[in-house]
């Protein structure tokens, strides 16, 4: 955070063991803004601070050597103007723009839970594709609950997203899953799965 304080960092870094036996930490970093035109605001919390944003992208990965603490900042989404601006301002902090994260690390990437939670919250309303339904809020979802005592009443504790093995393109991958119900009801209506392609 002291090296690049302009990014928001995920609270759940994870370790990866490379092919040569080294252990590295993978830390997801986000660019955010509250000035993106024609975009819905949402509230986030980081470092004990609450703020409203309408733009967030997981455009930077930080690879940290678990032994000596060496940090490497990679821009994984070169279409993000904010990340590219930071890279141009601080060229010595980031790896070369053409540098790729080693495959023995990138193949173990998982979908970042912080970004997923922001997306999952917005999907409760913005799953609608019909403008009239969207503006009338006729079809709003809720996060599924457990320990609910009534099938028609919104009680119980919200079921948080969880990592599990999912099958995609005939391949088993680690994915994040969030289950939805219609608002104030307890029957499953949809679920959101987050997986990564190994590049970002």
Where are these regions (language model features)?
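Exposed beta-strand-loop-beta-strand "reactive/processing" segments of non-cytosolic proteins
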Residues: 6-63, 136-184, 189
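Extended, regular secondary-structure scaffolds
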Residues: 1, 23-27, 41, 48-53, ...
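Acidic/polar loop patches that form or flank catalytic/metal-binding clefts of enzymes
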Residues: 7-12, 71-74, 116-117, 200
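Accessory, solvent-exposed terminal regions and/or long lumenal/extracellular loops of proteins
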Residues: 82-200
